[in-house]
Amino acid sequence: MGKKHSPRFLATVEQSRAAIQECNITQFASMLDDGGEIVVIDVREQHEYDAGCFEGALHLGKGVIERDIEKHPISEDARIVLYCGGGFRSAIAAESLTRMGYSNVYSLWGGWRSLVAADLASPNQ
């Protein structure tokens, strides 16, 4: 069962979604298959990340991503895919990175749940 979100939060998410690039799980899988460089960033909270993550994902929670992304060697034109639980927090974070000058940022619609459903990731046992 999904979480119930406030109308203001949902409005913020929709504004961000209108301003960013999104990909679905099929498009994400194609990005992985095409062999190009891709930086995957998990923007979930630490306890969510600890429970399981996409293999090789960098963990930069939504609360610190703007502050900490430049601590990592990621070029402004690198293909970056952000994910959270379902695609809401990652959309907001993607908008922030776009404003910071990163030009090839995507939010994975469906997030962690879509990764697990597609067998691209699994929760820790």
Q: Could you say what each language-model-derived stretch is?
A:
Residues 82-84:
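Short, surface-exposed ligand- or partner-binding patches at beta-edge/loop junctions that are enriched
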